Amino acid sequence: LEMLKRLPDEYVQMCVTSPPYYGLRDYGAEGQIGCEQTPLEYIDRLTEIFREVRRVLKSNGTLWLNIADSYAGSGKGVWSKSLAERPKSKQTYHSLNTDENAALPKKWDGIKEKDMIGIPWQLAFAHRADGWYLRSDIIWQKPNCLPEAVKDRPTKSYEHIFLLSKSPHYYYDTAAISEPVAPVTVERNKRAVSDRTKYAKGVGGAKPQALFLPRSHSDMPTKRNKRDVWSVSTNSHRGYGHFAMY
């Protein structure tokens, strides 16, 4: 936050970021994000940071915010263990309290043990209320998601990428991220149009015999607007010193 405050107004075009997720890891740094005692404190802190990001963005700039949800503790596993008892490979949460036995609170008002906290949408709504334009919720689907030792719910395999803008009109290059039209759609578009359907009368201005002719290749789109479910495999963090490669 302090570094952001040193940047001038409307300095950058776009911000792509993934802040530390709530209650997931302890990076061992004083004042780190994600170690707040309540989800509300976490949301408020990120809202304050991204308010400064909005100031730094150009008037037609955008923010692409990657975030995932967290679960309230069930009282089992590493959630209930002291720092000394937790497996180092997990790098899981512990309170910034100097007490080595301090653990993450297992529940909060309105959130029961084992509940999904709902961090992504709470954060999105907080940003919208703070002045951002909430434009899209992109689902990042992970084909190689990590397995989970759970028996009472599906394994998590996606995260959210929220597209937010500073203004109602902003720079967005649709063509740059357009995707190919499905081959089956291309083949279907090559076919002649028949008048033996309930939609035939809707073909205004066309001669009846023209409805049976194959369509011109120039009329067939080869690209379509990018969809909001993206299947992207994650990368290994080995050799990079970072636990959340994307």
Language-model segments: what does each one mean?
Residues 1-246:
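Core catalytic lobe of class I
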